[in-house]
């Protein structure tokens, strides 16, 4: 028994050691999309998540054909966003500055999603938020940035004078938002410990 294998196959001790050391795949964070769930279960995107069946896959495929200032294809293996990764990314962006207090627009979110996808390999279906009006909480547990409406008087003040840019998100008067609210990214450390989105909208997490 096993004689033919022992004669023909080499390298088993090395493979056995790799198997012994292999760590289980990290669980995707609560709130990620269907494609990330696919990556969590199978380690790759399956036929159930293609450009024809998944809006995030279709969007990503379209971005790969455009010039966005940096290569879109990831430098590392594709994987789902995890709680720890979302938390680490939140701390990094808070420490480096630039996102906290920035006026939100879909284009800006796209740029951030593509940068994270390219440098870290996290599939861009993790940065989703609860619906408005009011504060929008992140669906992905561990992502510590929420979207907060800007007070109307601050919008008016920012738009005074002739120097304001009509294409700036502040001047768009919430055109990206169904509620027509101008939103700003705000860091909130409580989001690391309390999953507000799940408490407010448990229906989003039935398949998690």
Curated annotation (Swiss-Prot):
* Binding to ATP6V1H, as annotated region: 150-182
Q: Where is this motif: Dileucine internalization motif?
A: 166-167
Where do we find the motif PxxP here? 74-77
Chain segments carrying region Mediates dimerization, Nef-PTE1 interaction: 110-126
Modifications made to the protein after synthesis: The virion-associated Nef proteins are cleaved by the viral protease to release the soluble C-terminal core protein. Nef is probably cleaved concomitantly with viral structural proteins on maturation of virus particles. Myristoylated.
Q: For this entry, list what GO says about its biological process.
A: symbiont-mediated suppression of host antigen processing and presentation of peptide antigen via MHC class I; symbiont-mediated suppression of host antigen processing and presentation of peptide antigen via MHC class II; symbiont-mediated suppression of host autophagy
Q: Does the keyword 4Fe-4S apply?
A: no
An example Gene Ontology molecular-function term: GTP binding
Q: Where in the cell is it found?
A: Host cell membrane; Virion; Secreted; Host Golgi apparatus membrane
Q: Which UniProt keywords apply?
A: AIDS, Apoptosis, Early protein, Host cell membrane, Host Golgi apparatus, Host membrane, Host-virus interaction, Inhibition of host adaptive immune response by virus, Inhibition of host autophagy by virus, Inhibition of host MHC class I molecule presentation by virus, Inhibition of host MHC class II molecule presentation by virus, Lipoprotein, Membrane, Myristate, Phosphoprotein, Secreted, SH3-binding, Viral immunoevasion, Virion, Virulence
Q: What is known of its domains?
A: The N-terminal domain is composed of the N-myristoyl glycine and of a cluster of positively charged amino acids. It is required for inner plasma membrane targeting of Nef and virion incorporation, and thereby for infectivity. This domain is also involved in binding to TP53.
What does the annotation say about its assembly with partners?
Monomer; cytosolic form. Homodimer; membrane bound form. Interacts with Nef associated p21-activated kinase (PAK2); this interaction activates PAK2. Associates with the Nef-MHC-I-AP1 complex; this complex is required for MHC-I internalization. Interacts (via C-terminus) with host PI3-kinase. Interacts with host PACS1; this interaction seems to be weak. Interacts with host PACS2. Interacts with host LCK and MAPK3; these interactions inhibit the kinase activity of the latter. Interacts with host ATP6V1H; this interaction may play a role in CD4 endocytosis.
Q: What is this protein called?
A: Protein Nef
Q: Taxonomically, what lineage is the organism? A: Viruses, Riboviria, Pararnavirae, Artverviricota, Revtraviricetes
